[in-house]
Amino acid sequence: MKLFSLASQPFLVTLCLSLLLISCAQTPVQAEVKLDAQFEKQVLEVIRKNPEVVLESLRAYQQQEQLKAQQAQKTGFQKFKTDPKAAIGQSPTYGNGKLLLVEFSDFQCPYCASARINLKTFVDRYPDRVKLIYKHFPLTQIHSEALPAAKAAWAAQQQGKFWDYHNALFDQQKTLNDETYGAIAKTLNLDIAKFNRDRTSPQATRAIEADQKLGESLGIEGTPFMVFNGEPLSGAVPVAELEKRLTSAK
């Protein structure tokens, strides 16, 4: 005879989750918790005789957590719309509009290179309606030059040449290296000594990390990723789609 029927699912779930949570505890205080032997035996028996209920309960729990994460993500996206000053921060901007188009990008990402063209075309068409904000999101696990390139672009920003440097990096994406960063800086007539100091400074590191942490807090995992007027977009979004979003923007 089963210890519990399916009708007793809430109690069953409590027992199962109690065992799972306590058995997975890692802190010293939690490690000292000892389960009553009979209670543990009951829970294990429940799991053995009612695996379908356990799986169903875990699936329901995962769905609840996903919904919570999605809601938190949506709230984060909306903050770009409700608090534009905070969204911009110290990031470089392009265009003078009130509708914010926040881009998370990686200079070594080929899809970001395609997105760059679409975004420039779009903002150039609607400069009084849209403002593009660039956020660094170097995918360092797969792009070895993404972080050095981001720091070089940040250094160029300190001399008012971010977008020119940004465009040059994407134009030379296949040959990104230290020599390239210096050559672009010379072409743009930057103060080379200052440029080199800035790109290797703690301030550059902190600025890039701040953008990365912001992206991670929003659940962003890849690039290019955009938030236009509080709504997420991913990939090299076509100009036509951006215009469609602009038409419906409030």
Regions found by a protein language model. Name each.
Residues L15-C16, L101, K186:
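Secretory-pathway extracellular proteins and peptide precursors enriched for disulfide-bonded cysteines
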Residues L139-K250:
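Cysteine-centric redox/oxidoreductase cores and disulfide-bonded domains
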Residues K2-T14:
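Bacterial N-terminal signal peptides that target proteins for export
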Residues L12-S23:
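Bacterial N-terminal signal peptides
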